[in-house]
Amino acid sequence: MEYLNLQRLDEISEQSFQTCQPYPWANIEQSLTPEGYELLRQTMPAVEGFDKHVGVKRAYGQAPHDRYLLHYRPGVEVAQPWQEFIAELQGPVYQNFLRRVLGNHTFIPTFEWYYAWEGCAVSPHCDAARKLATHIFYFNTEDDWSSAWGGQILILDSERKFKVHSGPTFDQLKVAASIEPRGNGSLLFQRTHHSWHGVRPLQCPQGKLRKLFLITVNIPSFQVWWRKVRGKDPDGYRLKAAPTGSRTEGVRYPCSASCLPICAYIPGSVGCHVPSPST
């Protein structure tokens, strides 16, 4: 079974991607094979296995990004189609696609599922410097998600008025594009110092979930290196999932003194994903 629609990926040229404004992005329709998309959609992970993030403080005055989140690591149990898809994403074909449109870098991909409920939003932000790009796959359809409920991914134009480490509101930014995250499609965008993006609060009925699968295209950085030394992946998670029910699973702990200068978290609020040696 092939999951990536290689013909569609081949149609994305480096020039068209890199010259897109206000920063490099592409909405890729039919980015998965029809059979692969349907198989993945039918075997999405159950929300009961996710961590629920509510009110997690962000830097620079940005509003929290509430959501259910499942971070993939060896040991995380997902359906066979998802194991096959992730293996394909780690293989040479997808890696070559990324190098063609993003440049000849060393990529360290990480994978997450995001589910969001009524009222959840993604406040405007630029991603961390270790994230060269993000590739978001949509897993709602017209049958289970109405466009009237929102959820559109907004490509925002700051007109270079705001520093990357700031917290502008939606009203202070222009909407360059509004991406409907439904059906077999995906959004690839490159991180820059002005790659602002966000999602306004969802207005869906209770019980409905907006479902996405994200690939974070990390590149080697001091932060990534330091986390690897400490047995973590680029996102700060242990390289292997903790056994179900263990103390570390789904819990964040305050940073230790040694990692406060390194971690990208706010001291005393979010902290690391795993206990420091002192806890």
Map each language-model feature to its residues.
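Fe(II)/2-oxoglutarate
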Residues: 1-21, 165, 229-255, 259
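Non-heme Fe(II)/2-oxoglutarate
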Residues: 4-5, 14-97
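Short hydrophobic-aromatic micro-motifs
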Residues: 26-28, 186-189, 271
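A short, polar/proline- and glycine-enriched secondary-structure boundary/capping micro-motif
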Residues: 50-51, 134, 236
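Catalytic core of non-heme Fe(II) oxygenases with the double-stranded beta-helix
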Residues: 78-79, 87, 95-228
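N-terminal low-complexity segments that are often proline-rich with Ser/Thr-Pro
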Residues: 248-279
